[in-house]
Amino acid sequence: MQTLGLSGESRRSDGRLKSIFWPTVENAWDVNYLGQQGFWICVVLAAIQLVVAAFSSNLVVLAAYLAAGLVYLMGGMGVRESSWPAAAIVFGIFFTGLLYTVMMGHLPGIVDVVITCILLSNVRAAFLASEWKPAGEGEDRPTRFSETMMDKFVDQLPAKLWPKIQPFFFAVAAALFALELFGAGAVAWHRSSGLVVAPHP
């Protein structure tokens, strides 16, 4: 069974909901499934950033959303290849954006909170996958398919690109994370100094 490239479900240890919010890794199928799942989560986030950017007339905002979309997409490739640092920085960028919203005096929406929890769970999944070792050399493992465009996108592209784009990803992601952290810190400092008036309800 294959849904959006999420294959090997019959041998997974967890149900779908648990794998999203509290994943565990007991075999190679768990590693493969969680990598695919984390990849799609990041791809969806990247698509959202691009949609928002498409409707923005402010060049600074446009550039910020395009950069975030690129980082989420590349980070998804890292997650597919069991890179927990990639998952961690994707979570950090999204969480810092949420923190900025709070600092501006707005409560985050339910969807934002759920996405934050999923991204944090993504870090756990990537870490567990990176630490998992097969019991033996000949242990059965899921196949990475390449028959369809979806297979190539989910199973083949991350494996080919991630080793090459890692330095670029971490450089861009670190810069974006630092800018967001600086922005949230600046807003917090101004608010504590009384220089920013809280919005009226």
Across the structure, where does each feature detected by a protein language model lie?
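Topology signature of small-to-medium multi-pass alpha-helical membrane proteins
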Residues: 2-200
